[in-house]
Amino acid sequence: MIYDFAVGQTNPETFPAEALKRAALRAIDLEGAAMNRYPGGKGHLALRELMAQRESERAGVSVNPANLVLMNGSMQAVTLVGQALMSAPGDLVITETYTYSGTIAAYKGIGLKLVGILVDAGGMRMDLLEARLKMLPVKPKFIYTLTSYQNPTGTTMSRQRRIELIDLAAQFDLPIVEDNCYGDVHFEGEKQPSLYAIKPDPRHLYIGSLSKIFAPGVRLGYLLAESPYFQQIVSR
C-alpha cells in the first residue's frame, strides 16, 4: 500500500454518514427558509455564528461572527488572501520551505513568488526568518504558515516560536496568514494556541476548515480577519 503524505485525506470510512444525514435533515427543518435565500457576501449567518462559537471555545477568546466569512474550503481562503494582499505579480510571500502543494500552485498561479524558510521539529526557524527579512531587497506582502501539523513535514510550531513569529511580524510590519486547516487532527497532548489567541493583532488572518473532521466533499472553511483586510477579501 502506498500513502501520499502530501494530501491531507481523512479515511472516508471514519465519517459518521448516517449521523450526518440525520443532522442535515434537522438543519433543513430549522434553517430551511434561510437556505432558500441568498446569504450575502459573508455566508449564512447562523453558520458563521456557529463557527465563531467554535473558535471562541477552541481559542479561549471571543470571536465576532462579523469578522468571519465562510469559504469553499480553506483553499479558497488561501487564494483570496493572496489576491487581496498582493499588489502586482512578482510580489513576495514568506512560507515554510516545504509547504502544501496546493498553496504553492495557488500562489504561483496568481503571480506571487515564494520565499521559503527552513523548519525543524519546532516549526519555522525564527532565526532564519529574521535574517531573510533583513536581507530581502523588497518587503514581502505577508507570512503564510501552517502552524499545526504542517504539510508536508508534520511539525507543530512551539508556543515560543509562535510568540517570536508574532513579534517578528510586528517588527517588520507584516501580516501573518495562519492556516490551521489541520488543527483538528490532534490526538494527544496539549493543543498549541492560535496566533490571534496569543496576542491579538489586526494584521493576523486566520484560516479554519472542517474538511478533516466533517465531510470533506462539503468544502466548509472560513476566514477570520479584521479591518482593512476583511473588507479587501470579502470584496474579491
Feature map (PLM): residue ranges:
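Short aromatic-enriched loop/helix-cap "lid" or pocket-rim segments at secondary-structure transitions
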Residues: F15-A19, T155, E188-E190, G217-R219
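Conserved core of the PLP fold type I
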Residues: A34-F172, G183-P202
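Short, solvent-exposed loop/turn segments at secondary-structure junctions
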Residues: G8-P12, M75, T99-Y100, S148-Q150, ...
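A short glycine-threonine-serine/GTX helix/turn-capping micro-motif
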Residues: V234-R236
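Active-site PLP attachment segment
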Residues: D184, K191, Y196-Q232
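N-terminal "arm"/small-domain region of PLP-dependent enzymes with the aminotransferase-like
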Residues: M1-G41, A46, Q53
